[in-house]
Design a protein with these regions (language model features):
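Short hydrophobic targeting helices and cationic amphipathic motifs
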Residues: 7, 16-17
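Bacterial N-terminal signal peptides that target proteins for export
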Residues: 30-41
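Post-signal peptide N-terminal segment of mature Sec-exported envelope proteins
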Residues: 56-92
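Active-site nucleophilic cysteine motif
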Residues: 117-136
């Protein structure tokens, strides 16, 4: 039996079992010919595991609590009717990310939403995070929250930060938090939020160069 967060190898494929709250899904990480020598396949599998372990040792843990939004001229976005307005000097990719996030505001929450199709009627935390980064050209395929633990580079970004742990992920873009939780209301979908939130056990990553 495979537990969430673990790898497995059989029938010509290497799998990763991701968990999003109570939702579990196998993700194919690598395929290979069954006829390929077992020693070579085992070496590839071992290399994948070691790489994952090595990456996790270089992670940066988020502080125990993310502070509430604070306006900084030329650096932070501002909210207007629930939508974010980016600073004029923000990079194009950041503006695209904000526009993508704005398009999801008021979408309802559903576990697995945004995973089966890019433009969906409902989104969960990793579905909405993936949508925003993909629209900005900063991600090529939808990920579950666990897989964001190795996204981009470690630490907070100048413009975009990704806060991730096994079971949840959210973004901070230009000082505003884009999250599906944190308001205390169950079933609420992706929203811009200005209040602080508990980030204990989260790791923080950012897109390269941002």
């Amino acid at each position: 039996q495979i537990r969430p967060g673990h790898y497995a190898m059989w029938t010509g494929r290497i799998y990763f079992l991701a968990k999003e709250g109570g939702f579990e899904q196998f993700i194919v990480l690598m395929t290979f010919a069954v006829q390929k020598p077992l020693c070579l396949v085992s070496a590839l599998f071992a290399g994948l595991i070691l790489s994952s372990c090595s990456s996790s040792q270089r992670q940066v843990e988020a502080p125990a609590r993310l502070p509430a939004y604070s306006f900084v001229p030329g650096k932070t976005a501002v909210l207007h009717n629930g939508k974010a307005i980016p600073p004029r000097n923000a990079p194009v990719q950041v503006k695209r990310a904000i526009a993508a996030a704005n398009s999801l505001v008021n979408k309802p929450y559903r576990m697995g939403g945004g995973h089966r199709k890019h433009y969906d009627t409902h989104y969960d935390c990793s579905g909405s995070t993936s949508f925003v980064l993909k629209e900005a050209g900063l991600l090529t395929s939808t990920r579950h929250s666990k897989l964001f633990l190795n996204y981009g580079q470690k630490g907070t970004g100048d413009w975009i930060s990704v806060y991730a742990k096994d079971g949840h992920v959210f973004l901070v873009i230009c000082g505003l938090r884009f999250d599906t939780s944190g308001s205390g209301r169950r079933g609420e979908g992706p929203r811009w939020r200005v209040d602080g939130r508990n980030t204990r056990n989260f790791l923080v990553r950012h897109p390269t160069g941002l």
